[in-house]
C-alpha cells in the first residue's frame, strides 16, 4: 500500500492485516468498498495485493497449497489429503486441451503449459484455473475443512 494512498503507518498495517485475512469474495468486496470510501481510487499495487489475497483464499478452499510459475508452466500443488472428487481430475485436465497434466506424488500437482500471451498476466490465469478447479473438482467440504485447518 503506497504512502501516497494511506499516509498513516498504523492504518496501513491494520489494512494489510485485514487484507491478509480475506477468506472469500464478500470480504474482498467489503475491503475494496471501504478503501474507495476512505481513500479514493485504489492504486494498482494495492489492487494486486487484494487480488493475491483473494486468490490465496480461493486456492485454500480448493486444497491448493502453492501456486508457482517455472519455465512456461503454471503449477498448482495440492494438499496430499485433499478431499476432492477424483473423477473431476480427468475432466479438468481435458478442459485444457492437452495443455494441463496431473502429476500424482507426495505433493500432487496440476501443471498448465502457458502460451506466450498468457505469461503476461499470471495472476489472472491462476484465478481462472482455480475457479475451474473449484467447479470441476466439486469440493465436498466446507471452508472450515480447508488446508489451513488440516495443517
Model-derived segments and their meaning:
Residues 1-151:
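Accessory helical-bundle/CTD segments and flexible terminal tails appended to RecA-like ATPase motors
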Amino acid at each position: 500500500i503506497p504512502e501516497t494512498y494511506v499516509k498513516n503507518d498504523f492504518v496501513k498495517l491494520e489494512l494489510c492485516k485485514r487484507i491478509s485475512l480475506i477468506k472469500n469474495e464478500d470480504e474482498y468486496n467489503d475491503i475494496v468498498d471501504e478503501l474507495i470510501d476512505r481513500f479514493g481510487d485504489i492504486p494498482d499495487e494495492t489492487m494486486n495485493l487484494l487480488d493475491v489475497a483473494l486468490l490465496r483464499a480461493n486456492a485454500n478452499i480448493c486444497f491448493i497449497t502453492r501456486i508457482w510459475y517455472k519455465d512456461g508452466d503454471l503449477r498448482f500443488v495440492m494438499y496430499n489429503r485433499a478431499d476432492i472428487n477424483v473423477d473431476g481430475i480427468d475432466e479438468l485436465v481435458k478442459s485444457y486441451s492437452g495443455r494441463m497434466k496431473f502429476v500424482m506424488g507426495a505433493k500432487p500437482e496440476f501443471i498448465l503449459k502457458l502460451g506466450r500471451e498468457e505469461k503476461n498476466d499470471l495472476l489472472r490465469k491462476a484465478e481462472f484455473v482455480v475457479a475451474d478447479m473449484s467447479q470441476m473438482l466439486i469440493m465436498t467440504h466446507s471452508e472450515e475443512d480447508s488446508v489451513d485447518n488440516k495443517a
